[in-house]
Every structure is written in C-alpha cells, then in structure tokens.
Amino acid sequence: MISFKKMHGNGNDFIVIENLTKEHSLSKSQLIKKKKKKKGLGFDQLITINPPKDSNHDFYVKFFNSDGSEADMCMNGVRSVGAYLWEGALAPKKPLLLGTKSKPVLIRPMNSKKVKVVLDYPVQKEIPKSEAKFLERCGLKKYKFINAGNQHLIIETKKVFSYDLDNLSSRVRRRKFFKNVNISLFTKLPKKLELRTNEAGAGETLSCGSASAATASFNIIDKSSIKIISAGGELSLRKINDKLEMIGPAEFIC
C-alpha cells in the first residue's frame, strides 16, 4: 500500500509520495493508470521524495509527468514537497536544499500556506536557424528559448487565449529539437504578466512554476519583482543578483 498526499501548487495538481526507504517503484504503465481522472487519482505530476544523492542536500526529488516521462524540474512541485515535509514533521521547519534531476533548489517556509523557492537565474538559449525558420512558418515572431530547470519556449502575444495552444504545442513538438520543451504564451499587463502553459508530458496545466520563472527572467531587473497570473492563481517573483526568488502557495487537497 502506497501512502500519498494529493496537493496543488497554484492549481498545478500533484500526487506526493514519501519514498525515503526506497520501497516504492512505479512503472510507466502504472503512472499512466493512476493519472486517469475517472478510474485513477488524476494529477499533472507525481512526485517522489527520496534520500539525498549529495551529502550537501536534504532530499532528492523526482517528478513524473502524467504520460509516465520524468521531468527535470517542477517549481510548483518543490513548494508542495516543502509543505509535505514540514507538515508531516519529516524535516524541521527551516530552509531545505532539494536535489533534482536538473539542479538543486532552496526552499523556505513562509506564512499563509506559502513557500519561497530560490533558484539559479534562468538562462536564455540560442535556437538554431533552421528551428527559428520553422517557428516563423508557425507564425511566431516574439519569443525566447529559456532554461529554467526545464526547457521553455516563451511566446509573447497580445492575448494568451488567441492561439489554439494544444495544436500549436503538438505541431512544435514534432520537431526533435523541441520534443521535450514546455510551450507558453504570455501577455504584458500593468505590473504583471498573464501566462498560459502546455507542459511536455502533461499537457496544458493551470500553472507552471518553471514557465513563470522563465517568463519573469527577461521581464524584470535586479532587485525588482513581478507577478505572474495564470488560470491557477498568482506567483510573485523577484530577481536578487544571480538568483530568482519565487513565492507561491502549496496546499493539501486530501
């Protein structure tokens, strides 16, 4: 019997499993079965909390998408992991360093069911000319390719709901270069950004933390902050030198 908690971070839907004794292992087919909303548990990502691989880290966290693939990072997910550990008394209520497939992230407990994540500043990447021409044929002109733990194609538009995002994402991911890339649309509003994301392996979600980080990274200056609004709620992001701080909710469903 696997013990778990159903949680969400800004509407991003998770199953969180404590696996500190390494007793649990789920196959890809089992993950897909648990994903099914009517017969399974339903989730955007399934998260396992494991013993640290590095002596400097407190825990090692794995993220599995609803199609059974493993994600490199999930910012909304690490906040939920923090809440799980602190509320379950599995760790003292203090900052924790979590190892991930991508890179370690620092989490800090906040008030009002919120958690702060401190991460390395997202990095903009170059897109090969052939892929840039392909995006142009898709009608895309204003975009950035960003590594924020996961790879993100961030597209600026006047209205985030003006595109068929599922169709666009499917078309773009047929290219080998973009196969595992998260695809987002954003628009600039007064003092905030509106964001919509289709995650590789999970589809469109109510919120994506790493997409929010990627989008904020080229829209703020040092020691300033910005709010990211998605269908699931609001995240607050701030640039501090070479780090990006994210504050958002982490709540238990059942």
Question: How would you describe each model-predicted region?
Answer:
Residues 1-111, 146, 153-254:
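A glycine-rich beta-to-alpha transition motif near the start of alpha/beta enzyme domains, typified by
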Residues 104, 121-122:
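Short, charged beta-turn/beta-strand-edge "cap" motif at the junction between a beta-strand
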Residues 113-120:
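Short, solvent-exposed secondary-structure boundary/capping segments
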Residues 122-128, 163-168:
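Short, basic/low-complexity N-terminal boundary segments at the transition from targeting/disordered tails
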Residues 124-140, 144-149, 244-254:
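C-terminal domain-closing interface element
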